Amino acid sequence: PNVKSQLPKPSQVWAEAQGFEAAPLTLLHIANSRGEIAEILVGAPRAGDDPFALGAIASKLPVGSYAFTAVPETPELVALGWCLELYKYDPLRPTKIKAVKLACPKGVNHAEVVVLAEASFGVRDRVNAPANLFGPDELEQAARNVAKAHGARFSVVKGAQLEKQFP
């Protein structure tokens, strides 16, 4: 739907003056009477675009809490994409994730999105880690931590035992 036509007249005038055409993943900040951001219009991705694409706006937004007024076509993927967009890797200077919070769209299992995002972050950390920071011992400890967190049994074959049992 044409969201601009549903906006209050001052917001419509502002959108027009800014030349906002709602191209995919473009943003338009609309201020309230005190000059504070009241809402942000976002150009939705086109049908068939990457289902995670809408999540890419998370890194373009100022710190704050956000919610979609219209439920996205794939709300689960948008919520996960939002989380994945905020990933940063820097083992020497741990960074805090930018506080751009999304209220989970209706019908989305928040806990599931968090588990998937955390799993992705863990894999990405290991892939991005230089070999001198993430060697066999660190890999073993990471695997041990995952096993422990999920109540799984864990064993390691190494050293002479590995030499003897390796195919």
Q: PLM features: what roles do these ranges have?
A:
Residues 1-167:
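N-terminal hydrophobic/helix-forming segments and targeting peptides
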